[in-house]
Regions:
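C-terminal target-recognition/interaction regions appended to catalytic cores
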Residues: 63-219
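Flexible, glycine-/basic-rich loop-and-beta segments that form/coincide
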Residues: 2-62
Length: 219
C-alpha cells in the first residue's frame, strides 16, 4: 500500500533513531528471504483471486458466492499461499451482491481514469456516482490505503468491490489467516461488533509487524 504511518518508538537509553535506520536498512534483506521484490502492484497481490476463475457457494453465507483460486502469477501470491496447499476456496473471499445499476457505475468508474485516483461526484467524471468518493484500482499501481468501507474501491479488472480476502492480501495477511464474524455492519452495531472488513483495515500489516519485531529483537 501507498500508506503513510505514524510510528512512535521510545527507548530507555541509546539512540531511538537507530530503530528507523535499522528498519530501512533491513527492508531489502527481509524481502529477499521471502522471495519478494518491492514494489508489489495490485495485480501482483490479488491477480489470482479474480472472479473469472470461478465461483462456489460461500461456506459461511450460503446466499452468497465465494471465489476460488486461480493460477499463481507472482512471487507475492506464492508467498501468501504457501501454507494452504490443497485448499481451493480462499477464506472470506465472498463476492458482494450488487444491483445491475451499481455494476454499471462500477464499469464507468473503471474507464474514467488511467490512474488510481479518488473520483467524487463533484468531479463529474462518472454518471450516476452518488457516493462521496470511489477509487478505481489499477492493476499495475500500488494500492492506496485499505479502508474499512468495502465500496471505497472498485476492482481493477472486474466491475465489483473488493472481497475481504483481497483487502487482506493488500494488507499482507497470508491466506492461512482466517477471519470470522460478520462481513459488514453499521449504525449502533459498530460499537459492539468488529466486522471482517474492519478487522483487516485496522490491523498493522503482518509483514510490516514482523519486520518491526526483527529490528526490535536486534536492538
Amino acid at each position: 500500500q501507498n500508506r503513510k504511518r505514524f510510528i512512535l518508538f521510545a527507548i530507555k537509553g541509546g539512540k531511538a533513531e537507530l530503530f528507523f535506520e535499522k528498519l530501512d536498512a533491513n527492508k531489502a534483506t527481509f524481502l529477499k528471504h521471502r522471495g519478494l521484490i518491492a514494489p508489489i502492484c495490485v495485480n501482483d497481490a490479488i491477480g489470482d483471486l479474480q472472479r473469472k476463475y470461478g465461483e462456489v457457494q460461500s461456506p459461511d453465507t450460503p446466499r452468497f458466492n465465494n471465489g476460488v483460486y486461480g493460477p499463481i502469477n507472482s512471487a507475492y501470491q506464492k508467498y501468501m499461499r504457501h501454507n494452504i496447499t490443497g485448499i481451493d476456496i480462499p477464506n472470506s473471499h465472498r463476492f458482494a451482491q450488487s444491483k445491475p445499476k451499481t455494476v454499471e457505475v462500477f464499469e464507468r468508474l473503471m474507464v474514467a481514469s488511467n490512474q488510481a485516483i479518488r473520483i467524487t461526484p463533484k468531479m463529474e467524471m462518472v454518471e450516476g456516482l452518488k457516493k462521496r468518493g470511489v477509487t478505481p484500482l489499477k492493476g499495475n499501481c500500488i494500492c492506496p490505503t485499505v479502508t474499512s468501507i468495502p465500496d471505497d474501491f472498485v476492482h481493477y479488472s472486474e466491475p465489483r468491490i473488493l472481497t475481504v480476502r483481497e483487502c487482506a492480501r493488500l494488507q499482507s495477511f497470508s491466506d492461512d489467516y482466517v477471519f470470522q464474524g460478520k462481513y459488514t455492519t453499521g449504525g449502533a452495531r459498530r460499537k459492539i461488533e468488529v466486522p471482517r472488513y474492519t478487522q483487516v483495515a485496522n490491523a498493522v500489516p503482518p509483514l510490516f509487524a514482523e519486520q518491526v519485531g526483527i529490528v526490535l529483537r536486534g536492538m
